């Protein structure tokens, strides 16, 4: 059996907030493509997804999941709920602007939900590769949001500049993670801390 599917149910439950947000975002994009007449309800769908993710997070027990890739604590729970609250505020506060600019498309709530997904993984990730993947998910969604106003040249310009800066920063983060792994032999934050505390490698280089 594939080891991914052999994971305990608790591991999958720990990712349920991200799964819910990703599922709702994907559904909104499908409806945008095949049933655009439903655009008025997309924002409500996104808010329902955020509320569901918040409810799941509130009931999530503390612990390490996915072989130590993700951690749930009271602190990560508080940050995650703050992220979801900010996402809900972003969905509600943008409605007037989107209507005024005639930009009520499904991509906006979908991209915002993917931003929230990346942020949740970033908050709860305790391993360098997980953190990097979360950062990239967040960045790709933000590139789309930066270019969302298709009729404005400044929006496209901002997206291009952000993409170039994001590519540079991603390269630096990945290179730094490779150096840390080379010095400590671990991508886990706990393993890195233990290696540095033991005095192995060259902490000054890091």
Task: Please describe what each predicted stretch is.
Residues 1-206:
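Alpha-helical transmembrane segments of multi-pass membrane proteins predominantly involved
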